[in-house]
């Protein structure tokens, strides 16, 4: 039985109220969190389908349960579409998340205690790239690399120097808060010079890679991991890609039975839908607009005294701002903007002096507002609203003006 809204509300009013409140929040808030997006009705329909009832441990054609003919078709569709989308020979669509994908990739590539290079959190790296509180930092010996202190860009010569000093078994390229292009060819040269493997986490830029708006890491990386949401605009989940048959077998074993049991076939179906959408030429137009909107916002922020664009701007879907010089930290900025219907997140910056719970900066992404229909004019308006709120963070009258303007903008572009 499939509940409609009225049935759901009647059956579980408390849960329905919470879901409805979130629906209203999404309708009324300008979403700038770089890792969030707005999926299609088709993606949601697939994820809410009867496939959620089916257990399917194993892989298509090699399951540990019967009755898997239909889910085999579903999973193979997702695999084949991902191969076409990214030019990969082998794809595993079963990871429940990006973190699960990274965990399995590490298991396939290295041994516990091995030395790994990963991007420092303050420079834009992810928890799974070696943070001491994360499984990655607890299981493997991660050595961080950062960015040039002056340019705040990846310093490939410095990364090479570190690699030669520590002789890693693996180098991880990719980030969760880096706004510039990543040169995967240079990373390949570095890994080859020390006899290491190269893993690329393209979770944030997968949508850009799919449309050639960012260089594809697959020709250079031994393994590529990603999420399927963010710029790819699919369901929350993970994926692993490689062109190496031997590694593909190790990856499959690392996912099942290594780190997961039954795959979420309803989510895999939603991934298949998202990949089909991403193969449509309209998706390339969408990504092009995402980049235009990001750059339009960057141009506006650059005009504001007291705000600093980290790395001088953006080549992708996100940008980072230092807000501390305005007399407000990242957490305070996040809470302040949330109160005026603008959602973003606090973010550490390369020269960070505050704790991860406060931070000196914020991260801003254009994927969700672009899905909503915003173009450059609206993106510039959004940047102006954010700037006005931050500059006037103690002025309730100005903040009320921002709140009303933000609501008006979301009403003009309903979900």
Swiss-Prot record:
It comes from the Bacteria. Disulfide bonds: none annotated. The record marks 229 as: Plays an important role in substrate specificity. It is found in: Cytoplasm. Pfam families: SHMT. (6S)-5,6,7,8-tetrahydrofolate binds at residues 121, 125-127, 355-357. It is an enzyme of class 2 (transferase). It catalyses: (6R)-5,10-methylene-5,6,7,8-tetrahydrofolate + glycine + H2O = (6S)-5,6,7,8-tetrahydrofolate + L-serine. This is Serine hydroxymethyltransferase. Keywords: Amino-acid biosynthesis, Cytoplasm, One-carbon metabolism, Pyridoxal phosphate, Transferase. The modification N6-(pyridoxal phosphate)lysine is found at residue 230. The keyword Cytoplasm applies. Its main location: cytoplasm. InterPro entries: PyrdxlP-dep_Trfase, PyrdxlP-dep_Trfase_major, PyrdxlP-dep_Trfase_small, Ser_HO-MeTrfase, Ser_HO-MeTrfase-like, Ser_HO-MeTrfase_PLP_BS, SHMT-like_dom. Its EC number is 2.1.2.1. Homodimer. GO terms for molecular function: glycine hydroxymethyltransferase activity; pyridoxal phosphate binding. Pathway: One-carbon metabolism; tetrahydrofolate interconversion; Amino-acid biosynthesis; glycine biosynthesis; glycine from L-serine: step 1/1. GO terms for cellular component: cytosol. Its cofactor is pyridoxal 5'-phosphate. Belongs to the SHMT family. GO terms for biological process: glycine biosynthetic process from serine; tetrahydrofolate interconversion. Catalyzes the reversible interconversion of serine and glycine with tetrahydrofolate (THF) serving as the one-carbon carrier. This reaction serves as the major source of one-carbon groups required for the biosynthesis of purines, thymidylate, methionine, and other important biomolecules. Also exhibits THF-independent aldolase activity toward beta-hydroxyamino acids, producing glycine and aldehydes, via a retro-aldol mechanism.
